[in-house]
Each structure stands twice: as structure tokens, then as C-alpha cells.
Amino acid sequence: MEKRNETGNNRLKRSNNRGKSKKDWKDASVETTPRETSVDEDNTSVFEDVEAQDSRQKRFSSTLEGNRFEELRSLREKEREVAIQNGLIDDPTKPRQLDEAVTFVGTCPDMCPEYEREQREYQNNLERWEINPETGRVDKNLAVKAFHRPAAGNEQALPSDVRPPPVLKKSLDYLVDKIVCGPDPLENTHFFVRDRTRSIRQDFTLQNCRDLDAVACHERIARYHILCIHQLCEKKQFSAQQEVEQLRKGILQSLCEFYDDLRKVKIRCPNEPEFRSYAIITHLRDPDVVRQSQILPIEIFDDQRVQLALRLSALAQKNNERVGHILPRNTEACPNLYTRFFKLVQSPAVTYLMACLLESHFMSIRKGALKAMRKAFMSAHANFPCGDLKRILHFDTVEQAASFSRYYGLEVSDDNGELSINLNKTAFFNDSKPDFRQLFSQTLVESKLQNRSFADIINGSRYNIDRVSPNTAFSTNIPLSLPFANKEPQPIAGFKKNTPETSVVSKNLSTFNGKFNVNAPVFTPRSFPTKPFSATDISSVQPTNLPNGSTNGTETFIPPVQNSITSNKEAVKPIKNKPKPISFESLSAVGNLIISDSLSRIVRQILQNLYTEWVHEKTNLVFATMFRTIFREVLLDGIASEVYLKSLKKHAISQISVRAHHSWVKKQEKMMLEMREKNRQEKYFSVLNSVVKAESSNITRLPIKRTFYGDTRNLDKASEKLRAEHDRTRRLWKPVLMDSLFSNLQKFPVYEDWHLLIFNASTSSMMKTWLCAKFSLKETNKTSFWHSSYNLFNRQYHVDMPDNVSDLPQTRLCYGACVYNVGLLDEEKRKDLANSDLNSSPKLIQGNDSRSAHESSANKLFSFVHDISRLTITKLPLLLIFWSDSNLDMQGITQKYRFLELITSTWSAISSIHVLTITNDRDMDLEHSLKVLLDNVTVEKSPFAQLEELEVVRKKREAEIEASSKTVKRLASNNKFLTDSNVEGLLEAPTSLENSLVEDDKWASLRQKIKAARDLLKKVETFY
């Protein structure tokens, strides 16, 4: 099978080679490494053709035993008729409207339908990854459905030929995990995976499946194609253009349509910004891409990846491209920011897949950069180093930069082992050639892979979707490097830039270091004549005009000066043999005079020009500064006036709107009160009528006289019932008089801020509302905290009800009492409480059992008590409220909720537990229960508060002992009469005092021992 594929590839090579001209072969030899052809290669190709024909003949002449293709083909039509009868597919003989079409649903459970497996095995059209190596036959667990191009003569697909979305996802997982990440390299499996993923997309299209499963599969397929564009760009059998077209028109276009359709049904795709950015990069130089991006939703358009792609698109625009029918149009006034483009690609903001897509545009951007550099550089400059070109355009090697330049006809020379390019306006540049082949970029693209596998890239690991930093992606402060390493010396101000005489003078002047020495040793330059200048000699020399140089309009002559001028006395020596016609002194005097006069005039003119330019610049600067200052003041005054008027209008409008809103709110409240009163009256009369009708229906027909009196009594009775019901409801929701209850606490020495804690453990909102009404609680700024306060006898009493204990202040407060609402106990829970055998059973309880809910309520109570014990200063009595339709077994309640353990635990701050069972409306009067609860208020400290006080006392005690020890040592060092034994005794006294204080923590003992320590210190001071 592999041999047949290789033969087909060789045929494709030869067919492509026949179409090439001699010029193309020559260009290909420059672009790539030339291949040597020989007679042996031709013989090999002929042998492969013969072998391919033999394999084709064997393939169609032999059949496998056990192949069911003929059997399945005979049953094909019957299966189609059954599918049409069952309404699974449309009948091709009966045309329908589009809205009446049958929704096609695939039923194939395997990665490849059975009919296709048998058919391709029969036709010997299997790939080696689909064949079981042990049996040599097709394997249903390895074969994947191939892509079938739709044509007019093809038969209609059956439901058994199409895979549903779960099977399609399974097939894609197999291709990624087993084929792409398998032992074979990516270039060998690309044709297989590309065909099978295309078949997956075809099955989604046949079923019109556009849900999240289809989106996820298309996203993974798109990532695979983007990965191949980079990884296989230099492979011979790979076509990057076809891959990009398949990605752009077949996958990304479908994904964009999926995103738009799902957004209409309020479904958000998390990876939409990522693939919108890929779509922008595939149309990098399309001027319409910005307009299409602006119609995206604001959250997609503002995403950092989309903004980064738009930034790259803006930097990739060119204005020097050759105009053609299929070529992208040039962008007017484009600055050709190619260096910023490559630096942004190299930054961490660009992900690996974005760099893979951008790699296909590198050569086009580099071509435009080369044309811009050629247009800007002059022929007088030296050749441009290939190393600098490699650095600016981010080639991997210098040889790549040289090959790229040779491809477009630029001359590349070797200067002492360093390659350089003749890059200027006069250099030849072949602009008609297509873009240079795509190169595998190691520095810009492959370095971003970061040791990740292909599966991580295709499946969209977090490394590939990192949040982009805004400062990195959209910063305009990208440092710009010079197009060459060293700058040429700038021309001296006052001279023309393009005149050769001026450049010569500037070069000659640059050789002088320091001041010009007129008294330097005399020499005879080679360019000077051996006799004095004459008028004819001077007139034959073309003078150089200084631009705006002299005020009198005269021309200044600049003699040529050699670069060999130096002040080294040893190198330049006067001529010993003086010529007789001209003396050495006269010649040197004339030369020095000419040089000094010329240079002095040049320097004077330069200084004058510099001074004039400096004065002009400073004048403009002062004028511009003064103008900006005046303009700024006028502008600020105007802005201030405008802002003041706007703010005044805004304030007036806001006041009017606030008053109008208050009036509207009052009107709405009045209307609500009227509506409530009206509804209450209507409800009252409706209940009254229903009661009257019910009573009237139970009375037999009597004479008219007795019926009249009977109706009157019924009305009175109904009115009494309604009044009694109203009184019962009022008593039920009547708030508790907390003032009278708190007044009984005056006999206790409680803290000034005393808190009554209410906690609702039930999930019923009605119970929570009832508790708020009974205790007159109001919601605070916190949404989960209700509070009310009372100021009695210079004490502040608070009633707090949080949703959770974590909503309470985390500082320790005085919670004097607590009301804990357990909630409603149904019949199953009461039976569970009464059943002692079940209570003591060690078996695990299921989560849906009533006992598990009861255990959960007991654990919740224990957790609540533990948290409150840490937050309260004093111990507190606890009132538990149970709701039930009958009396409870208190013994079972006590055992299940472990009241004894709650009271006797060392960490618990519960002083007593009281239980209130509400079975009817009369039990809802909480005044008696609260009075009993408040009568059991205690001032005893909680265990955690006691520990905190002991810790404070211990630290204070240690500080006093340490201070006393320091005092004793200080006195001992200052008193010579104290012996070592006395000092040791004085030092041991605080230690013994500390030990005794540790044993006895009573306050009286502590005071006595501290007093003894003070007396000891007084004795020491007296002795001193």
C-alpha cells in the first residue's frame, strides 16, 4: 500500500516538472538545493511505473475471502426503501418544500460505516493505519470514514452511512491522539488526517448540526490545519496555499456562521475571539477586514486577541506592491512599519498558532521591506550587511537573508567572509517574481511551542489561549532599530546634502581631531603641485558654492584635502633636498597660508550659519511657546465657562428630576395603599359571601319570615368568624415587646452592648419572614443581615439575625442569648427520633434518608454552637424552636441533638438549653419563652474569652517579671556591696513568683504576689 502511494507521488512530481520552463528550473535551483539527475533516477522512475501498473492489476483481479461487499450492495436498495417509508430520508421522486424537508439523522455507531469498510477493502483502497497488522484485514476500530466528493451521479447517503455527533467527536479524538501524535511523522499522516477530518465536517453538514459539539470539532480541525501550515511548509508534497484556502473558506467561514447562529439563541462560545483573530490573520491585507470586525459584538471586538490581530493587519499593510488583477491593493499613505510587525510577532502577546498563520505572510512583508529599503538607500553608501538584514527582517540565518536577496536579483558579495548586498536605487530588483517560498521560522514561530505536544495545541490547551497583556499587544512604544549598524556621519549644517564637493569637505573635516594647528610640520601632499598656484590654475578648478554661505554673494574655493593629514612629527618630515627653483620655506608658507585661509573662512561661515539657525530656532520656539500659552489660557477659559454652564444645567436638571421622582414615588405609594385597601375590602366581602353561602346551603327551606331571621344570624356568625380569623392572624404576626423583656436585664451586670442572636436554620422563607416580623428586624446594608436596636437605661441592646455565621462581625461581642429555629419536623423525622434502635445503629445512612437530613440538622447545630462560642464573650442560654403538627419526644430530641454534650463540652459557651415546640397558633407567642430565656442570662465568661484573658495576664506577668529582673541586674551592677549570692537570691525571687503564679491563677493570689515582688524591689532600692 505504501508503495502505491509513493508511486503516485512520483507521478505527481514528474507531471509538475514537465510544466516547468528553463527559467523556472533556474529559479528553483537558486531557491532550493539543486537535485542531481542521472540515468539511474530515470530507470528507477520507469521501474516504479511498471510496479504501479502491476499492483493496480493485482488489486482489481483478486478478492478477499469473507468480504461482504457484494452482499451489502444487494441489500442497499431495500435499506433505502425502508428509510424512505420510515421518514428518515427524503424520497427523491417526490419533491417537497424546503420547510417540509426531513431532518437527516445519522445512525452509524462506528468511525467508518460497515458498507464503506467492505467496499474499500474489496477495492483495495485502505490506508495502512486502517489495517489490522495481525490479520491483514480492515479493522472496525481503526478504519475512519473517508471523504466523498459530492457529485451528480452519486447515490443519496443513508442514515447508516452518516455518523452522529458523539461518534464524530470520537473519530476526531482517535485521529488526534493515535494518528497525529502517533509514531509516524506529521508529514506522513497529513494526507490521511486531512481527508478524514474533511469527512467529519461533511457529516456535520449532512445532518445540519450547528451546536456546540460541531463548533468544538471544527475548532480542533482548524487548529490542526494551522499547525500544518507551519510544520510542513518546507515539505515537497505540501501545498501551503491549498491548506490556507481550505482553512479560510472551509473551516473558519463555517465557524463564523456557527458563532452568529448560536448568538441568536443566547449561546456564547468561549473560543470565538480566538478564531475571529485567525480569520482576520488569514485576510491580513484585506482592507475590508476592519469593517467586518467592527460589526462584531462589543465583547468580541474588544477582546485582546481580536485587537492584536487588527494591530498586526495594520502593520502588515504596504504601498509599494506591484499592481495586478489578483494582487492585493496598496494602502495609501502607508508607513511600511515592517520592523514593528516582526517585533510584535516576536513578543509573547502573539500565540503559537497566530505565529503559524502569520508565517505565510512573512515573505510578502519582507519583499515589501526590501523594496522600501532599496528605494531609500543611495548608491553612494556602502553595501548593506546581510547580518543586519537578517536581524531587521528576523531571518533564522544569514544565508537565508542572502538567498532571499539573490532570488529577486540583488547582488550579494562576500567582503572578507561577511556577506553584503548591493541595496540602493540603482540596483536591479526583479519585482515580477512571485513571493519567495515559505521558510520554517525557528526564532519567530517554533520558539513559541515551549515543549508542548501537538495534541495540546490541537485540543486548545491553556498555553495556546493565554490572556493577552494589553501593554504588550497594543503598545505603540515598540523600539525601532536602525536599518544598519552604524550611522553615516551627518553632513555639516549649511552645506547641500547631495553635492559631492560638500561630502568631500565633510569627510576631510571629520579627520581632524581637535583644533587645526597652523604651526604643524611642513609636508608636501601628493595632490599639491610643486610650484605656486597661478591664476589660471585657480580658475580651472570648479568652485563650490556654499548654500546661503556668504552674505556678499562671492564664491569660496575649497581645495582638495587628503585624509592623510596628521600632526605626527615622526611620520611627516620636511624634505631635505630642496629644489632650486622653489625654496622649501616659500612652498610651505604658501601651503599653510592657503590652508589656513580656506579653513578659517569655512569655519567662520559654518559658525555664522549655525548661529543664524540657532537664533531662528530659538525665536520660533519662544514664539510657539508664547502662542501656545496664550492659546491654552483662552481655551481653558472657554472650556471652564462651558463646563460651568453644563454643570449648572446638569445640576438643575438633576434637582428637577429628583423632585419629580420623589413626587412620582409618593404618588405610586399612595396608589399602592389605595389598591391594598381596595383588595382587602374585596377579599373581606368575598370571604363573607362565601361563608354566607356555605351557611345558607346547610339550612332547609323555611317560611319567609323565619328565613329572614336565619339569614341575619348567619351573617352575624360569619362576621364573628371573620373577625376571629383576623384576630388570630394579627396575634400570629404581632411583634414581641422587646423593651419590656430587655428591662428585666437591668438586674444583671451585663455589658453596655448586649446582643440577642437569632438564627434561622430552616430553608423556609416564610419562617424567616415570621422571625423578622416577631422581632421587628430590618435589613441592613448587608443583604444577608437583619438588625434592630434598643437603648434602655444607658445600655444598648441589639437583636441580630444573619443568614450565615460568617456574616457576623469577626470580633468578640457579648452575645447574651440565642434563639435557634430548627424548622419543620415531618412525620418520618419524628418516627426516627422515637426509634431508639435506629438511633443506635452503626450502619451508614443514605443521603436521601430522613435520618440523614436529621443528622445534617444536628451537625449544623453543632457547627453553629462552635462558631458562636468563639465569637461571644459570655456564656449564653439557647432556645431551640421546633415546628411540628404533634408533640415531640423530648428524650429522643435530647439524645439526637446531644444536648448534654453541647453544655458540658470544654469549648462550648452554652449555659442552658430550652426547647419550644410550635404545634398550633397559640404556641407562636414567644413572650413567655423569651422571658424564660432571658431569666437564664449569665455573666460567666466563655471558654475562648477565658483563654484570651489568661493569655493577656500571662504576657503581662512575663513583662513584669522581665522588668523586675532587669532592675535587679541594674542595681547589682551599680552596687558593689551586693554579693553574688544576694544577686542570685534576688533573681530567683521573680522565678519563684512566676512558678507560684502559674500554679494559682486566682486574682487575689496574683495581686499578693505582685505586691511581694514590689516590696522586694523596695528592699533592694533601700539597700542600695
UniProtKB/Swiss-Prot annotation:
Swiss-Prot/TrEMBL keywords:
Coiled coil, Cytoplasm, Nucleus, Phosphoprotein
Q: Where in the cell is it found?
A: Cytoplasm; Nucleus envelope
Residue stretches of biased makeup (Acidic residues): 39-52
Q: Which residues carry this modification: Phosphoserine?
A: S841
Question: GO cellular component annotations, sorted alphabetically?
Answer: cytoplasm; cytosol; nuclear envelope; nuclear pore; nucleus; transcription export complex 2
Q: Which family does it belong to?
A: Belongs to the SAC3 family.
Organism listed in the record: Schizosaccharomyces pombe (strain 972 / ATCC 24843)
- State the residue spans of region: Disordered: 1-62
Query: Spans of biased composition, class Basic and acidic residues?
Result: 22-38
Bias category Basic residues: which stretches? Answer: 11-21
Q: What is this protein called?
A: SAC3 family protein 1
Q: Where is the PCI domain?
A: 243-433
Coiled-coil features, chain-numbered ranges: 945-1022
